[in-house]
Amino acid sequence: MYKTKIFYKSGLFLHGRRYIYRKPKETNYWKNYIIVPLYINDKEVGIDKTISEPEYILLDIILYGPLKIKLSEYFNLNNKIIDRTTTYKKLLEKNTIYGINFNFTFPILLNFKDSENKYQLKEYLDFNNILQIYLIENKKYIYRELRSKFDWDEYNVLKIRLYVNHKSVIFIKDKYLEEPTELEYIVLDLFLLGPLEKEYSENYKIIYLINERNKRYKDMYDMGEIYGINIRFDKLDYFKFLNSEYSTEERIYEKILFIYIIT
């Protein structure tokens, strides 16, 4: 079993061989912090009594690093913190700035306390020479893999005959009637199932729109208006298509819904 070692001078706790922990500074510490005038959400540190404990903890993490960090990342991150605070001091000494205001919303604190990799800092100098720093949480993404071409014969979301550029997506006796190209399978996959990469906050919206559209196709099939879908494209700009920068046109011919993808 690993033993916990304490670095008495630094106040760091080494737990086993994986993480380093530290405690945040007490509130009274910040009342005497005069390296540079500090503000949190426009409230002056050490003077404004309405600054909350979470705000003080976040200020502590910005200037001294995470409360919990992997041992393997400690030295690189420590150097990064030192460079950041040194830059602030130099700006103050040169009278380039008169203070620093850290702007953030409380949900950021949940991810911010453990890792610098989960957020980014956006800075700008305002008219009063106060350095405004905004903490912005990095975007999170959801990923999925392309569907195997051998799985399309079992595709049961629409239960409709599928075609890509007039080529039938049906698997019979280990041979396709006319096999779509790799690009055609990719277009089929992305159009019916959505992007391979979605921002977490946009995932619900994208899935909802895709499901609503596919439901409309299914309703048309159930009402006997169509019995198949033919996805058509010509001279497709693949990069625009990947970024969902395309439009569609639809028309029905002999009970086949033709969907033209235009980039």
From Swiss-Prot:
It comes from the Eukaryota. GO terms for cellular component: plastid. Keywords: Plastid. Pfam families: DUF613 (PF04764). Belongs to the A.longa ORF167/ORF288 family. InterPro entries: DUF613. It is found in: Plastid. This is Uncharacterized 32.5 kDa protein in rpl14-rpl12 intergenic region.
